[in-house]
Amino acid sequence: MCAMILKNPDKNSEFANFFTKMTACFGDFSLFEQQINEIATVAGIDLSQFMIDHLAVRMNSVEKAEQWRIMLLVQSELLKESEVNGRPIGLFTLLQPLNFLNQQVDVIELPFPKGKTYPQEGWEHIEIVVPFLADETIEQWIARLIKQFQLDQNERLKVKISQPKVEGERLANPSIAISLKDETNQNNCCLKFHPYDIKLIVRSES
């Protein structure tokens, strides 16, 4: 069982117990930090300069997804649950934020599985916010980030661009995902860029 002590322990013993259960399900939190930091270092990204708006997990069975959903709701509120590409994806706002790489992050994304088998279940990626410039199109935003971080020239990175469309969302939410090509080090995590804080995207729907 994977567990760790809360980085910012307080008198909320219920949340501390929840955190222990969460890391037992999702995996070693400090290892997740190390893996994300490794990707950022390879890509030349200073994460302290960007907002980390949410963390995400992955699993290989609907049964596990349902168990994790129940577990999260013990110490979080459901921010939103949407159908994306034929599967439900839930966003949960924790009652107490997690300290992730010196940032306070309180949203966890939990998507139900859809056929793909992940080599490792649990913590999978983070998303950082890189806002659009004035009058910038999606294509220009993508091109700017690829050029800024030289993503197309870094032989150690895999790059995936996507534009998921969620019913009701009014703000465009393209993403650029980067991960390490060399998986011999067991780093199966991913770092994603997108232009809006996920909470702003949700608020824009109402």
Predicted features along the sequence, with ranges:
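Glyoxalase I/VOC metalloenzyme domain signal
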Residues: 2-53, 57-87, 92-206
